Amino acid sequence: MNNIPSIEAVKDIRSGTCGPVAAPAVTSDLSENIILTSLDDLHNWARLSSLWPLLYGTACCFIEFAALIGSRFDFDRFGLVPRSSPRQADLLIVAGTVTMKMAPALVRLYEQMPDPKYVIAMGACTITGGMFSADSTTAVRGVDKLIPVDLYLPGCPPRPEAIFDAVIKLRKKVGNESFLERKKITQTHRYFTITHKMKRINPLVNGSYLNAKTQKAALKAGDDISLPTKSESIETTTKELN
């Protein structure tokens, strides 16, 4: 009879085993500084909050960056820090017409940028060649024939608000990427797919323009009034000096 527990002892045992679990002894300051996240979210958050662009401007669209950097728009609030070296940049903003002579330099700058890297094509001349796409023999009809483009920003020129919208859309794209599956993703844009439909023409200044039909009348008129040629004028001047 002495081994039978009392009613009070049974109540104490039940309250200790079946009662509510006590709150963990964690301070409020520590609980407010703990964030549960994944590697993808942490990596993408760090990159989209600190995009460092390399500004590649060749024409009038690039003037909009003067207003963009100013205090009215202040693109530093997006974490954009312009860099002068492609090895320190992860965003290439191409603004203006790209010519055949500048194409190798643009491709070299893109290849020197570390991965992951992104490209924004800014302006009509960058995207399609713009007003130079019809008659110019040196303008590239779209920068996507040289390097991959992630975001197209049309306009002539685009306003600073449009550039902000493009940066926000690019940040969303960066935030949805996977750290482990990035190398498995292939480009699906028009990269090296459309060729330039150009034909070779003879140079206009070839040294024989005086033989054209439009110049023969002027040469005949000069002979009729006995105008001295260039060599005769030089000989006359030399004799006078001697």
Curated annotation (Swiss-Prot):
Q: What class of enzyme is it?
A: translocase
Q: Which Pfam families match?
A: Oxidored_q6
Topology versus the membrane: Peripheral membrane protein
Q: Name one GO biological process term.
A: photosynthesis, light reaction
Q: Which domain of life is it from?
A: Bacteria
Which InterPro entries does the UniProt entry name for this protein? NADH_UbQ_OxRdtase-like_20kDa, NADH_UQ_OxRdtase_20Kd_su
Write down how the cofactor binds this protein. Binds 1 [4Fe-4S] cluster.
Q: What is its EC number?
A: 7.1.1.-
Catalytic activity annotation: a plastoquinone + NADH + (n+1) H(+)(in) = a plastoquinol + NAD(+) + n H(+)(out); a plastoquinone + NADPH + (n+1) H(+)(in) = a plastoquinol + NADP(+) + n H(+)(out)
Chief subcellular location equals membrane
What PROSITE patterns is this protein classified in?
COMPLEX1_20K
Q: For binding [4Fe-4S] cluster, which residues are annotated in this chain's numbering? A: C60, C61, C125, C156
List, separated by semicolons, the cofactors it needs.
Answer: [4Fe-4S] cluster
Keyword DNA-binding attributed: no
**GO CC, alphabetical:** plasma membrane-derived thylakoid membrane; respiratory chain complex I
Q: What does this protein do?
A: NDH-1 shuttles electrons from an unknown electron donor, via FMN and iron-sulfur (Fe-S) centers, to quinones in the respiratory and/or the photosynthetic chain. The immediate electron acceptor for the enzyme in this species is believed to be plastoquinone. Couples the redox reaction to proton translocation, and thus conserves the redox energy in a proton gradient. Cyanobacterial NDH-1 also plays a role in inorganic carbon-concentration.
What does the subunit section of this Swiss-Prot or TrEMBL entry state?
Answer: NDH-1 can be composed of about 15 different subunits; different subcomplexes with different compositions have been identified which probably have different functions.
Q: What is this protein called?
A: NAD(P)H-quinone oxidoreductase subunit K
Q: Which gene encodes it?
A: ndhK
